[in-house]
Amino acid sequence: MARFDVRSLPAVWTRELIIFKRYWPGTTFTAVLEPLIFLFAIGLGVGAFIDEIAGVKYVVFVGTGAVATAVLFSSVFPGMYNTFIARVFQKVYDGILSTPTTTAELMVGEASWVAARTAVYGSVPMMATIPFGLTPRWGMLLVPFICFISALGLTFLGQYISGLVKVIDSFSYFQSALLTPLLFVSGTYFPIDGLPRWFGTISNVNPVYHCIELVRDACFGTLSRASLWHVLALVVFAAITGTLSIRVMTKRLIT
């Protein structure tokens, strides 16, 4: 088993922070704007025809769901594209791995960095929904932590995908066949309770669904023991995708 020393992570984070200072305006603009577009276009647009859904205003329902949209876009795509570019085009990882840093430390360090900034980006749609009827609650303070653990697993997923493809254009297959279904089979825009049972079964293996459910529990003040199931699902997802990411990237970079 590859060595993993948590003391190596600050070095990876420092490198990411230095790079982030150069391109943060573009990254932040995109990460914040896309979920807000979903919020205003769908939440307010469809909300003009649908007043309430699942007991809350539709714009509030979509606004809390847009948190997961921000998490998905801000984590999987950096995991895929940034990792592929650094590995294939820039050859950055070759230099990093010539130091005592291992592949596991590198992947975990980069994923945790992306997850940390996604925790901030993911909270923006929630804050933007408050003027439209979302009541501020103490539970909202948990949303950044929910975004972090969700983004960690999704970033690992992006890293794993980047290790599978040989050309960058292949990402379009995963975007259409995997990421789009993850978004729509999650309860972002409509509740899944009234849908066929098989739909609910699929959603139970969807990390975006568990992220949304936890966010809504925190925002609506409905956290309960049942919420622990969603936490467990996200932790297991991160553990699985993290293992897959480290294995495939070790194969690509070392063997």
Residue ranges and their predicted role:
Residues 1-255:
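Hydrophobic transmembrane alpha-helices and immediately adjacent juxtamembrane helices
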